[in-house]
Every structure is written in C-alpha cells, then in structure tokens.
Regions:
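Nucleotide/phosphate-binding catalytic cleft detector across ATP-hydrolyzing
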Residues: 1-61, 76-192
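Short, glycine/acidic-enriched loop or turn micro-motifs at the edges of active sites
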Residues: 47, 67-69
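Short beta-strand scaffold segments in enzyme catalytic cores
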Residues: 62, 69-74
Length: 192
C-alpha cells in the first residue's frame, strides 16, 4: 500500500539497521511488463507473476482472490501482458448486505446445494457460485483472446473457498506471493 510503504521502510531501517528492499521500479524481477504504465502494477501482482513463471507452464493466468480479485496474464515469453481487477467476494457480500435490508451478514462457505431453500442458503450459493462461474468465464475469454490454452493458478485468502466450485481446472497455490518475493530477493540480494 503506497501510503504506508515509506513509513514501514523507515521503521524497518531503524529497527534492523539495514535498508530494506522495496519491490518496485529498478528491482530485478525477470518479468517483462507490457503495460501502459509498468510502474503502476502492484508489487503483489509482480511477485505472483514471478513465482508463476518459475513454478508453472506458460502461458499462465494467476487469479488472486482478496479484497479485490485480480487476474494477471503472463504469455509464453514471460511477458506480463495485462489482466483485470474486479470486486472481491468479501466486498461483494458486504455491498449486498449493506444495500438490502432483508439480507444479513453470512459466513462465506458453500451451501449443500446450488438452489437455496432459504435466504442464507441463497446468499451463500449466489456468492460462491457466481464467483466460480465468473472465473470459469474469464478463463474461457482469456484463452479465446490469446488463441491458446493456459495454465490457471489461484491464490489469495478466498481462493480456497471458490476454486473447488469452478468447472475449469484451477490450481491452488496459497504461497505464490511469498515464493515470488523470495525469488525476487534472491535475484537482487547480491546488490544489497
């Protein structure tokens, strides 16, 4: 989060007596970012993509399901070619419960059946299966645009709840971000 990066960096420097590495422009990643403004690409997306190119077959789509859901696309030449951002499952559920007075907060877990028999089941089914169907459709459209099949990997706090309900094969890697940060650190540590 850009607003707190500098404060955290200064605090880490003070405590550790070393300058921390901050993932951003100028840090070696091995990733060629083909975006209109590569510097705007979030460090989390860069780290995920770096781990993805080291761990999985290319081309690749990485779905990160957190507050926002993101999809990052890496082609067979290790180029980060773009992606998409859409409201995360928790944000969608919060908006639904805040705007519809009859609907209360629920836990995010799959109901026993897709067709709900009460309000809570209907909300759970809607949240889980609409997200799963969206991911299936997004992957189909990415493959159509690229003209080839892709490997799909999901990560992030909510991926485990949705991926089992997708029809597409989507691999789950909950440590993808940390793997990417380690790879980037190893590429740059000689210079620190």
């Amino acid at each position: 989060v850009p607003q707190i990066t500098n404060a955290v960096k200064l605090a880490a420097e003070k405590v550790l007596k070393k300058e921390p590495m901050v993932l951003g422009p100028g840090v070696k990643t091995g990733l060629n970012i083909l975006m209109d403004n590569p510097g705007q690409l979030g460090a989390d997306l860069v780290a995920n993509a770096v781990a993805g190119i080291h761990e999985y077959s290319l081309p690749l789509a990485i779905i990160d399901m957190g507050t926002a859901s993101t999809v990052s696309v890496v082609d067979e030449k290790k180029h980060y070619v773009g992606g998409m951002i859409f409201p995360g499952m928790g944000v969608s559920l919060d908006a639904l419960t805040a705007r519809a007075s009859q609907l209360s907060g629920i836990s995010i877990e799959a109901p026993k059946r897709i067709i709900g028999k009460n309000t809570i089941e209907c909300m759970k089914s809607g949240v889980i299966y609409s997200n799963a169907a969206a991911l299936d459709g997004i992957v189909d459209r990415i493959e159509e645009e690229l003209g080839q099949k892709i490997t799909v990997v999901a990560t992030g706090g909510l991926a485990r709840k949705i991926i089992p309900h997708c029809k597409r094969e989507i691999l789950l890697d909950e440590d993808l971000l940390l793997k990417g940060l380690l790879i980037i650190y190893e590429k740059n540590r000689k210079e620190l």
